[in-house]
From Swiss-Prot:
Belongs to the peptidase M24B family. It catalyses: Release of any N-terminal amino acid, including proline, that is linked to proline, even from a dipeptide or tripeptide. Mn(2+) 2 binds at D240, D251, E416. Its cofactor is Mn(2+). Binds 2 manganese ions per subunit. It holds the Pfam family Peptidase_M24. It is an enzyme of class 3 (hydrolase). Residues 638-650 have a biased composition (Basic and acidic residues). Disulfide bonds: none annotated. GO terms for molecular function: aminopeptidase activity; metal ion binding; metallopeptidase activity; peptidase activity. Residues 622-637 have a biased composition (Polar residues). Keywords: Aminopeptidase, Hydrolase, Manganese, Metal-binding, Metalloprotease, Protease. This is Probable Xaa-Pro aminopeptidase SNOG_02267.
Length: 789
């Protein structure tokens, strides 16, 4: 245990004052990266007593033509002996004595050279001319350092073994999750995505290499990395993927069926053969074993199995091995070192027959502390077979084409584990399931490992106490409250228009809409259809309407070629349903329109009378036109009133009727307006609504007992002057007034609406509802009788 004295503590506080935060929780050498131990090992391999090693780290840089940083990957040789992003962190986290900035290295080298009395060399990895150390007249060796470091890196210390074991644990959990979900997937990209998801959630953001998710024939390509094809009817998936934890790698491969059981006898046979190759080779692992011998053993087992399956024939095991035909199905080596690199360094290839220099250890024999992979495989590469082995008479005579064609759909099978060589045997660091355990996980559909949080099925789901603690991403402090770490639930409300959208990724909210007046805007097609209804006249009709005395038009005609304004009683015909009307495109009746315009002018004249009470309107000529043939008095009176020279009495008995009829005639199609203003109520006016009140009069003579709501269909006609208006007979106007009088009394403050009579298809109607103020001084009956007289 390191003891902090006053001097060292003061030095650390000095670093803190400069803005560096020192991690006092990592004080013991066992918790630090063993950089000193690695340096002593390199010194031992170099066989020197004194010297200086110069290594430069990776320089951070941006992407070309961009201000965004490029992915940073520290140089492994540099990291092996030092590492660390800042001076303070390097001093505390890594087992070193002194730390300097790069621009201070040159001065340090000069001081070292003068104090060493030329007794040591300066060791570099590369040509010193390419390094920034300059010329210090010191002897520089750029040849010996890399081989020595390669040999040193082959043997892992306890700290490195711990990191590699951690990387294997995370990768094994990811493989388990893939197995438990493989029956849900249909594409290679989904497999890769889930694997990366699990690794990142366990603080292993970087992968040791690009994952290989090869299905079917793609498994015959050793370094396939497209990972984007559908499974279809393919049989197997070969997943070669391993994460990196604190720069130390893992390398794991599993091959599994894309169904709950082996899809074919051929697939099961090849898997059992590869499984036997790996098991027998792993059992032979021990210190002092030459790894090349295990590679040869794997080939012999493969040849025996291929002969038994009938893929190879016409030769003995020795003949086929000497011819090299087995490499058509097992083309790579049995394994490699693993450490800071997925294919970690060594003095020579792991399966090389040559030995190293006398000063260096032999590289092809296993030693305690090595971590190697054992990854046999059998592949059916159509490209390699067609272009190299089948055209060659040396190999083609041993290959049975008839049997080979049955095995081509298998693609390839590889099984790979990371093995630590111990003092007497080995330890398998990989815990990813294989064999029967693998099939059981696929069949169950779950892995029994809480590697990733279960997906929240609803934003309202309460988190129970039995849920495992959430995993923290890199950089999140352990003291962060759990409430902050919990995933944010998606919004629990949505527009009412979208409630019917059923999606697994969007949870509908069954409550009220946030927008009280929300209405969906019309689409382009709807706008075009609406414009055509308003502007394009047509004589086509799809409604079979039988004229009836119950539905009488304003003009007195019930022709079907035009759209009339009807006067109907307040009740719906029996047996009709609301909302059953169909939109029709018909030209408006000119006579109905002219009558409505005339009534509108009358309303305007009556409303102007309120502004000038002293001027009274004489309405008797209008009503007495039935007996007097002078039409000119009506038109002149209307024109005179519109100019505003005269006004009606404020309480004219015609006020409410004129206002009501004009409002009914002039409201636009499908318009929805608010309630009448106070001024409108005082004037006896009305505004159309989607809904009306169904009031029943207490009197038995009231024909408006069942007045119902209506919808507006009549388009807004023009209110400009029409010459034909002057030629209207007073008889037609009088008939309209008398018809309204016969439909019911004029008492009360009522409302009327113009629109399509609900339950009667295609009938725009003037509904004489009981919310229409007609008179204050007398009844319509009295006025009509005086007009008749």
């Amino acid at each position: 245990m390191e003891v902090l004295d006053a001097t060292s503590l003061a030095e650390r506080l000095k670093w803190e004052a400069k803005g560096y935060w020192l991690h006092f929780e990592a004080e013991t050498p066992l918790e630090k990266y063993p950089a000193k131990q690695h340096a002593r090992r390199v010194q031992e391999k170099l066989g020197i007593e004194e010297g200086l090693i110069y290594l430069s780290g990776q320089q951070a840089r941006n992407n070309e033509d961009s201000d965004m940083p490029a992915p940073f990957r520290q140089l492994r040789y540099f990291y092996y002996l030092s590492g660390g992003p800042t001076l303070a962190e390097a001093l505390v986290k890594y087992d070193v004595d002194e730390v300097y900035y790069s621009d201070e290295v040159s001065d340090y080298i000069i001081d070292w050279y003068h104090h060493s009395c030329n007794r040591g060399k300066l060791y570099t990895l590369h040509d010193p001319a390419k390094s920034p150390i300059g010329n210090h007249h010191a002897p520089i060796d750029s040849v010996s350092l890399q081989p020595a470091m390669n040999v040193a890196r082959m043997i892992k210390d306890e700290h490195e073994i711990k990191l590699i074991r951690k990387a294997n644990d995370i990768s094994s959990k990811a493989h388990r999750e893939v197995l438990s979900n493989i029956l849900k997937f249909t594409n290679e990209a989904q497999v890769e995505g889930l694997f990366l998801d699990v690794c990142v959630s366990h603080q292993a953001k970087q992968q040791a290499y690009d994952p290989i998710a090869a299905s079917g024939p793609n498994a015959g390509t050793l370094h396939y990395d497209a990972n984007d094809e559908d499974f279809g009817k393919r049989q197997l998936m070969c997943l070669d993927a391993g994460c990196e934890y604190e720069l130390y790698a893992s390398d794991i491969t599993r091959t599994f069926p894309l169904s709950s059981k082996w899809p074919s006898k051929e697939a099961a046979n090849i898997y059992r053969l590869v499984e036997r190759m790996q098991e027998l080779c792993i059992k032979r692992l021990a210190p002092g074993v030459r790894y090349l011998d295990l590679h040869i053993l794997a080939h012999q087992i493969a040849i025996d199995g291929l002969l038994a399956l009938g893929i190879l024939h016409n030769g003995t095991k020795e003949e086929i091995y000497k011819a090299g035909t087995s490499r058509a199905f097992f083309p790579h080596g049995l394994g490699h070192h693993i450490g800071l690199e997925v294919h970690d360094v060594g003095q020579a290839e792991l399966m090389s027959v040559r030995r190293g220099k006398q000063v260096l250890e032999q590289s092809s024999h296993l030693e305690e502390g090595m971590i190697v992979t054992v990854e046999p495989g059998i592949y059916f590469s159509v490209y390699a077979l067609q272009h190299f082995y089948l055209p060659s008479p040396v190999h083609s005579k041993y290959i049975n084409l008839e049997v080979l064609n049955r095995y081509l759909p298998v693609g390839g099978v590889r099984i790979e584990d990371d093995i630590l060589i111990t003092a007497k045997s080995y330890e398998n660091l990989t815990t990813a399931p294989k064999g029967d355990e693998m099939l059981e996980i696929i069949q169950r559909g779950r892995s029994n490992v809480n590697s990733i949080p279960a997906r929240r099925q609803s934003g309202r789901t309460q988190i129970t106490e039995d849920e495992p603690p959430l995993l923290r991403a890199p950089g999140i402090s352990a003291s962060t409250p759990q409430s902050i770490l919990r995933p944010i639930a998606r919004s629990s409300t949505m527009p009412a228009e979208l409630k019917q959208d059923k999606s697994v990724d969007f949870e509908p909210f069954e409550g009220p809409s946030l927008f009280s007046n929300f209405r969906r805007s019309m689409t382009t097609d709807e706008k075009i259809q609406r414009w055509q209804q308003d502007h394009i006249p047509t004589t086509a009709t799809r409604i079979n309407l039988t004229p009836s005395s119950q539905y009488k038009s304003v003009c007195g005609s019930n022709t079907r070629e035009v759209k009339h304004v009807y006067m109907i009683s307040g009740s719906f015909p029996p047996g009709t349903a609301r909302g059953a009307l169909r939109e029709q495109i018909l030209p408006a009746c000119k006579q109905c329109t002219i009558l409505c315009e005339t009534l509108d002018r009358l309303r305007q004249s009556l409303s102007m009378s309120k502004e000038s009470p002293e001027a009274e309107l004489d309405v008797s000529p209008v009503i007495s036109q039935k007996q007097i043939r002078n039409r000119r008095s009506v038109s002149s009176t209307a024109r005179h009133d519109l100019r505003g020279d005269r006004e009606r009495p404020q309480h004219s008995p015609m006020t409410g009727l004129a206002n009501g009829l004009s409002a009914m005639c002039l409201e636009p199609l499908n318009h929805v307006s608010e309630s009448p203003t106070p001024s409108q109520r005082r004037a006896g006016g009305c505004t159309p609504h989607w809904r009306g009140q169904n009031r029943a009069d207490q009197s038995g003579d009231d024909a408006l007992r069942a007045a119902q709501e209506t919808q507006i269909l009549q388009s807004k006609p023009s209110v400009r002057s029409n010459p034909a208006t002057d030629q209207l007979s007073a008889k037609a106007v009088s008939d309209v007034l008398l018809e309204l009088q016969r439909q019911g009394p004029a008492a009360g403050s009522d409302r009327c609406t113009l629109g399509k009579q609900e339950g009667v298809e295609g009938i725009p109607a003037i509904s004489r509802a009981k919310n229409f103020h007609v008179s204050t001084g007398g009844s319509m009956v009295g006025e009509a009788r005086r007009a008749e007289e």
